[in-house]
């Protein structure tokens, strides 16, 4: 039984698009790729990485759980962050819901260059979002989502390059102004539509009067 257990501990099967970082006495030894791999028992051990997992409880409420795992997924990942408050340049507090798509390109850097990769990516995305949206007014934030996405993508890609991570896309799911601001915007939009209707009606009556006068003449 001891011999069989030792033999089984030497064998590591890694799935496609996944890797395992192996350490020997606490020092990086090698990276196990997809397929059948052989390691030295006792001396070689897999290094765990902190990772985010979204779970749903009995009541149907989703929550994020960060747990250590030995396998590193090289496929494109998506982090859906909770809404956060951002103060715009005209001192309006809005809620922004963002999503981040990224992929681990260098598993060794992702393991050793940052202590907690998911937490670091989340904190960096939130602070960068506050900086970008804080330089814009409310109207600019509502009408310039592509600009915010591109600026965030540039900042995140440059900052995470040291961690062996490639940020592919940053998307803003929703921008929610305060309730009183929404009511004011609706009143403004309604007033603008009424003004346009009055102008069109006046222009129509004016044109009708001109044509009628020309006909009488």
What annotation goes with each model-predicted range?
Residues 209:
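Basic (Lys/Arg-enriched) interaction patch that binds polyanionic ligands
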């Amino acid at each position: 039984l001891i011999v069989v257990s030792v033999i089984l501990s030497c064998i590591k099967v890694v799935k496609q698009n996944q890797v395992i970082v192996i350490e020997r006495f606490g020092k990086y030894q090698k990276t196990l790729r997809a397929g059948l791999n052989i390691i030295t028992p006792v001396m070689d051990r897999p290094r765990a990485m902190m990772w985010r997992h979204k779970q749903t409880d009995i009541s149907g409420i989703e929550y994020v759980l960060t747990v250590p795992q030995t396998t590193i997924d090289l496929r494109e990942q998506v982090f859906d962050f909770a809404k956060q408050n951002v103060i715009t340049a005209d001192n309006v507090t809005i809620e922004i819901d963002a999503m981040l798509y990224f992929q681990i390109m260098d598993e060794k850097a992702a393991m050793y260059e940052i202590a907690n990769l998911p937490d670091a990516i989340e904190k960096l995305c939130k602070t960068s979002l506050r900086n970008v949206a804080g330089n814009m007014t409310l109207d600019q934030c509502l009408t310039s989502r592509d600009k915010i996405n591109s600026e965030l993508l540039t900042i995140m890609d440059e900052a995470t390059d040291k961690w062996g991570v490639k940020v592919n896309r940053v998307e803003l799911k929703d921008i929610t102004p305060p309730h009183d601001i929404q009511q004011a915007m609706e009143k403004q939009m309604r007033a603008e539509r009424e003004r346009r209707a009055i102008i069109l009606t006046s222009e129509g009556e004016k044109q009708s009067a001109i044509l009628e006068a020309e006909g009488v003449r």
